[in-house]
Amino acid sequence: MDDIRKIERLAAASWPAYFQKSIGKWLLRANFGVTKRANSVWTSADMPEGDFQLEAELFYQSLGLPVCFHISNASPKGLDDALADSRYEKVDECFQMTALCRSIMSRTNDNSRFTYKWEQEPSSVWIDEFIQLEGFSPERHKGYKHIFERMPPCKTFFKMYDKESLTALGTVSVIDGYGGLSNIVVAEEHRGKGAGTQVIRVLTEWAKNNGAERMFLQVMKENLAAVSLYGKIGFSPISEHHYRIKR
């Protein structure tokens, strides 16, 4: 359980919201509605005193956001059932996966046809290209900018090209010996050609060179292709989480 709590803590630290408010050891997080992770109650710690549900509902309602709880294997027992009884809907079941850096490097091969660009802080162009590849609304730019600015300082925002064609993007931040992967997206026309594996390899190498021994990421359970890819290159699930949203 200690390892699970650590991963959940690092995952929260690597994806910080614009607004964060403590409620005991939990965190109320809000980020203009961009990503559930940054707009949910982080609950991977002991239960707070008082009426946490009312406090959360007042917090999110005051911001005009859905009331959402992040429930993991490290959350207090009985919390998920209590929220279900209060008509909170279960959505977005995910794995937290981890791998040793050396395992990833030994299971992947460098592909020299790709070229790379790196940014310590993401430019507006990087954010726009990420949003475009993901197929998201341009209105999400501000929300992502706030998250990316607040990530731990040891981080990089990466672009990969095949010749001059933008192929993929990704981000890694290093904290407490772990590299947290996020924002990995491959352009549709380049999928199925090894680009995803190469992004993870290159970002893992960067993280390893900046003090990481292990990597972690989160992935939707229903994304079977991604779960399979991550498993082949050394990742295995350490924890599961989902969200409960007030309907």
From Swiss-Prot:
Protein species of origin: Bacillus subtilis (strain 168)
Protein name, as recorded: Uncharacterized N-acetyltransferase YobR
Gene Ontology MF terms: acyltransferase activity, transferring groups other than amino-acyl groups
UniProt domain N-acetyltransferase: residue ranges: 102-247
Name of encoding gene: yobR
EC number: 2.3.1.-
Family of this protein: Belongs to the acetyltransferase family.
Enzyme class: transferase
Matching InterPro entries: Acyl_CoA_acyltransferase (IPR016181), GNAT_dom (IPR000182), MshD_Acetyltransferase (IPR050276), Rv0428c-like_C (IPR056935)
Statement: the UniProt record of this protein carries the keyword Transit peptide: no
Record keyword Transferase present: yes
Top-level lineage group: Bacteria
Entry keywords, A to Z: Acyltransferase, Transferase
